[in-house]
């Protein structure tokens, strides 16, 4: 058995793992990152790259008015008592410090996403103007040979243009508002300038991971790809290393030991691609085919920690979002649910929620019950997004430009249905025609008045962010009445699972009795979320992942200094 030795071993190369490794290296600890996949970046690289950390230096430079007290009121209020208040406070108090460290030691550049509100902006302490920041486009050529190892983007943008989160909402208004035209010109100019100057610009999550990788290059931290974590190594009751194997080898291949003199930080994602774990912990219907999380996320870290007695929390939940299960690649729906001229109905042909609500809560409503939990299968799965031709002519849908034809393969699969009448559409989708027609008629009356009397769609600043400001009187309500009609099947997809290892304020793994598993730390989706069952705003996954990776590495360094 081959043996290597470092002070710190980090498992996983997403934002949590990279920040942890960066901190450890800058504190003088020899560090290695091991990654099962052939690319680094994990689900972070596939994401929008948003980071939700109130009162950080990027927001302050932009003059965003906020206070620690307001952020504390907001987060404690929406999370509730399911998460220890000390963990919430640690995140809020240390998150800005973490971000300043990262900005200092990497070429990462961040900017505010103006108007992208907190997901519950009307709650006490919530901000309609938003607290989310995102990475500016990054020239991946700066990575040198490591450019080839960057996790590919989840979705391909037409003409390979580089789009930021704040671009997308304006591009969706291209056919409806002058701001859409201006933003389209700006995005096009950015892309042409990059090509003319020989740059390979990347955006969103890849623009976050790329600079972090350069930070590790400068700090001398190797990132070992195709290196699958198989188990934890324990010596004298302390986690003192990891077993790994080449990802190309059979699972029965003899593992190699990498010793960790000071600690192991698990940052290897959730279990969204582990069918058995999903069936065990999560409510039916559930599958690995609806997630957009990185394919390497199969719960390896959670299972290894559980064998050592680690407590697991919130395993029944995920970073859900209503998703169109397109053949080969599910589509996580955002603006599609907010744009006027659409509704979501269950198999009874009835609405059951505010279609534009935050995506985690929307899937909780799809499942039914408190936080989506209850006996038996989910109550509103599948659901159907119903819209008309005017909606298609005006807005982006599942990556298709306004007016672009629905691909025949989508129609052939039955995931998308099309018909000249609502009754015919109902037949194709398996819905009761009379009920669907009545539901649409009632909704159309709300659209004309501008008031959703049933579910209050369009009343929240979050709803309106992805709405159409030129649509009056409500930017989220539009009549469905211009044939042909379309139906898109909706299922509870996710960005990744939520549940994982219970940790303390320093990211240390805990047992059920509250005792510490010495030498073992966890951050990101391998750990139970500080956000509980909720989601505070754009970047509410990546912000805590980075912060607790930072705190874990600092604790290891501090303990090493005491020895």
From Swiss-Prot:
FAD binds at residues 7-36. It is an enzyme of class 1 (oxidoreductase). Disruption phenotype: Deletion mutant is unable to use cholesterol as a source of carbon and energy, and has a limited ability to multiply in resting human macrophages following infection, reflecting a failure of the mutant to inhibit the TLR2-dependent bactericidal activity of resting macrophages. GO terms for cellular component: cytoplasm; plasma membrane. One of its GO terms (molecular function) is 3-oxosteroid 1-dehydrogenase activity. Keywords: FAD, Flavoprotein, Lipid degradation, Lipid metabolism, Oxidoreductase, Steroid metabolism, Virulence. Its cofactor is FAD. It comes from the Bacteria. The keyword Flavoprotein applies. InterPro entries: FAD-dep_OxRdtase_2_FAD-bd, FAD-oxidoreductase_2, FAD/NAD-bd_sf, Succ_DH/fumarate_Rdtase_cat_sf. Pfam families: FAD_binding_2. One of its GO terms (biological process) is steroid biosynthetic process. Its EC number is 1.3.99.4. It catalyses: a 3-oxosteroid + A = a 3-oxo-Delta(1)-steroid + AH2; a 3-oxo-Delta(4)-steroid + A = a 3-oxo-Delta(1,4)-steroid + AH2; 3-oxochol-4-en-22-oyl-CoA + NAD(+) = 3-oxochola-1,4-dien-22-oyl-CoA + NADH + H(+). Involved in the degradation of cholesterol. Has a clear preference for 3-ketosteroids with a saturated A-ring, displaying highest activity on 5alpha-AD (5alpha-androstane-3,17-dione) and 5alpha-T (5alpha-testosterone, also known as 17beta-hydroxy-5alpha-androstane-3-one). Is also involved in the formation of 3-keto-1,4-diene-steroid from 3-keto-4-ene-steroid. Belongs to the FAD-dependent oxidoreductase 2 family. 3-oxosteroid dehydrogenase subfamily. This is 3-oxosteroid 1-dehydrogenase. The lineage of its organism: Bacteria, Bacillati, Actinomycetota, Actinomycetes, Mycobacteriales.
């Amino acid at each position: 058995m081959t043996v290597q030795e470092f002070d710190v071993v980090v498992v996983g190369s997403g934002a949590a793992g990279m920040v942890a490794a960066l901190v450890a290296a800058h504190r003088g600890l020899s560090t290695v990152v091991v990654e099962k996949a052939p690319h680094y970046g994990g689900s972070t690289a596939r994401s929008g790259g948003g980071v939700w950390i109130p009162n950080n230096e990027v927001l302050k430079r932009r003059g965003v008015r906020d206070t620690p007290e307001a952020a504390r009121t907001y987060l404690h209020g929406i999370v509730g008592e399911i998460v220890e208040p000390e963990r919430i406070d640690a995140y809020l108090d240390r998150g800005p410090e973490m971000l300043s460290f990262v900005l200092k030691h990497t070429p990462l550049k961040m900017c505010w996403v103006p108007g992208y509100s907190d997901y519950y902006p009307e709650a006490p302490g919530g901000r309609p103007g938003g607290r989310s920041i995102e990475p500016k486009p990054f020239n991946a050529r700066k990575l040198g040979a490591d450019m080839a190892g960057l996790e590919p983007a989840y979705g391909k943008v037409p003409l390979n243009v580089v789009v930021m989160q704040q671009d997308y909402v304006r591009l969706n208004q291209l056919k409806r508002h002058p701001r859409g035209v201006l933003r389209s010109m700006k995005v096009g100019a950015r892309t042409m300038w990059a090509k003319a100057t020989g740059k390979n610009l990347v955006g969103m999550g890849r623009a976050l991971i790329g600079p972090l990788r350069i930070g590790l290059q400068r700090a001398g931290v190797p990132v070992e790809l195709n290196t699958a974590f198989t188990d934890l190594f324990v010596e004298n009751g302390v986690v003192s290393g990891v077993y790994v194997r080449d990802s190309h080898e059979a699972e029965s291949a003899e593992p190699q030991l990498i010793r960790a003199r000071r600690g192991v930080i698990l940052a290897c994602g959730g279990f969204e691609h582990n069918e058995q774990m999903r069936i065990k912990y999560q409510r039916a219907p559930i599958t690995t085919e609806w997630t957009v999380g990185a394919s390497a996320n199969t719960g390896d870290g959670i299972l290894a920690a559980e064998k050592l007695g680690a407590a697991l929390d919130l395993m029944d939940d995920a970073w859900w979002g209503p998703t169109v299960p397109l053949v080969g690649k599910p589509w996580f729906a955002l603006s599609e649910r907010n744009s006027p001229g659409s509704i979501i109905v269950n198999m009874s042909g009835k609405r059951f929620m505010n279609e534009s609500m935050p995506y985690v809560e929307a899937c909780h409503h799809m499942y039914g019950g408190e936080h989506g939990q209850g006996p038996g299968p989910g109550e509103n799965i599948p659901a159907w997004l119903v819209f008309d031709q005017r909606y298609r002519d005006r807005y982006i849908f599942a990556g298709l430009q306004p007016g672009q034809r629905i691909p025949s393969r989508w129609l052939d699969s039955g995931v998308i249905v099309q018909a000249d009448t609502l009754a015919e559409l109902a037949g194709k989708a398996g819905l009761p025609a009379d009920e669907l027609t009545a539901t649409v008629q009632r909704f159309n009356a709300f659209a004309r008045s501008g008031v959703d009397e049933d579910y209050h769609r369009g009343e929240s600043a979050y709803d309106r962010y992805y709405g159409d400001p030129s649509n009056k009187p409500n930017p989220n309500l539009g009549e469905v009445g211009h044939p042909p009609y379309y139906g898109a099947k909706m299922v509870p997809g996710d960005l990744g699972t939520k549940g994982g290892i219970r940790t303390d304020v320093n990211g240390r793994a805990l047992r059920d009795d509250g005792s510490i598993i010495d030498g073992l730390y966890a951050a990101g989706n391998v750990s139970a979320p500080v956000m509980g069952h909720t989601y505070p705003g754009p970047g509410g996954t990546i912000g805590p992942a980075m912060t607790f990776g930072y705190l874990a590495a600092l604790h290891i360094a501090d303990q090493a200094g005491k020895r």
